């Protein structure tokens, strides 16, 4: 039983990183890098883009042009919570958060900066489409942790659908956190018109989110899938830099007319 001074949370299970062979394969296909400070966004080309003919048709018939602002309902944006928006690994030890934990004044300032960066990102994304937070944590963790660390974002969270993949699918798939995420993502196809949604953007620190995003995209008649993988278990400074970089480049990612596989990486020295 959890004591009153300790909050039990469930952090997303981590999938293993890409193998060296997979990394080398993707690095050969990397067309460009966008940098900021000591982090960069690595863009990786998909070997097969099944949407090319569709894009060409839209351009030729002038049904859609690169400068045309997509309709709001044509975009789904899915966030992970732990270690993507909230520095959960920093705030917890062994999956447990202690309510009486004390932060240094320096760390408190960094949490406040993170709060502003998360607020900026959520405000931007909610203007562009339907936003979801899908987490493998327990049902109340997003609400509790935002009240504790990010109170400024609470009003905007009320406009966002928050889903606990664990809460929805743990009984059906016990111990299989990968499948929880996939099923929670697929649940979204029941809430939208599969023929209208053309832009799916997935942001998370685990390969689970990236895989689930691609599986969801495959259910749509036509969709562009953009995945943005954050670094796992970031320190406060690291998450600040990652969010700054994504905030800076999000509009370009959103308006891109192709599938994108993006990883936030340290600059190579």
Task: Locate the predicted segments by residue.
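Non-catalytic pre-domain segments flanking phosphatase-related domains
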Residues: 1-81, 88-99, 114, 256-269
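C-terminal cap/substrate-recognition subdomain and adjoining C-terminal extension
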Residues: 3, 7-12, 33-38, 68, ...
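Eukaryotic beta-rich interaction modules
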Residues: 54-70, 111-124, 143-146, 183-187
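Short coil/turn segments at beta-strand junctions that form active-site/ligand-binding loops
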Residues: 73-75, 129-130, 194-199
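Acidic di-acidic motifs
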Residues: 80-82, 204-205
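Catalytic P-loop NTPase motifs of RecA-like helicase/translocase cores
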Residues: 85-87, 210
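Surface-exposed beta-strand-to-loop junctions
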Residues: 92-104, 122-126, 160-169, 192-194
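Short, acidic loop-to-helix structural element flanking the phosphoryl-transfer center
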Residues: 105-133, 139-144, 175, 179
């Amino acid at each position: 039983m959890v004591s009153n001074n300790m909050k039990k949370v469930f952090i997303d299970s981590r999938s293993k990183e890409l193998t060296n062979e997979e990394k080398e394969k993707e690095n050969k296909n990397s067309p460009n890098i966008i940098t900021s400070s000591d982090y960069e966004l690595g863009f990786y080309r998909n070997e097969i883009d099944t949407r090319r003919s569709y894009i060409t048709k839209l351009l030729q018939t002038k049904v859609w042009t690169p400068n045309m602002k997509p309709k709001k309902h044509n975009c789904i944006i899915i966030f992970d919570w732990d270690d993507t928006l909230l520095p959960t690994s920093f705030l917890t030890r062994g999956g447990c958060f202690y309510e009486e934990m004390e932060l240094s004044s320096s760390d408190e300032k960094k949490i406040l900066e993170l709060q502003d960066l998360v607020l900026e990102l959520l405000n931007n994304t909610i203007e562009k489409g339907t936003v979801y937070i899908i987490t493998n944590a327990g049902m109340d963790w997003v609400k509790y942790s935002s009240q504790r660390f990010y109170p400024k974002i609470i009003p905007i969270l009320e406009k966002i659908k928050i889903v606990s993949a664990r809460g929805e699918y743990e009984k059906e798939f016990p111990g299989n956190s990968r499948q929880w995420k996939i099923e929670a993502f697929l649940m979204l196809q029941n809430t939208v018109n599969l023929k209208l949604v053309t832009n799916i953007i997935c942001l998370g620190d685990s390969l689970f989110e990236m895989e689930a995003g691609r599986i969801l995209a495959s259910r749509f008649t036509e969709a562009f899938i953009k995945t943005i993988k954050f670094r796992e278990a970031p320190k406060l400074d690291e998450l600040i830099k990652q969010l700054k970089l994504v905030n800076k480049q999000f509009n370009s990612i959103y308006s891109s007319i192709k599938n994108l596989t993006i990883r936030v990486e340290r600059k190579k020295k």
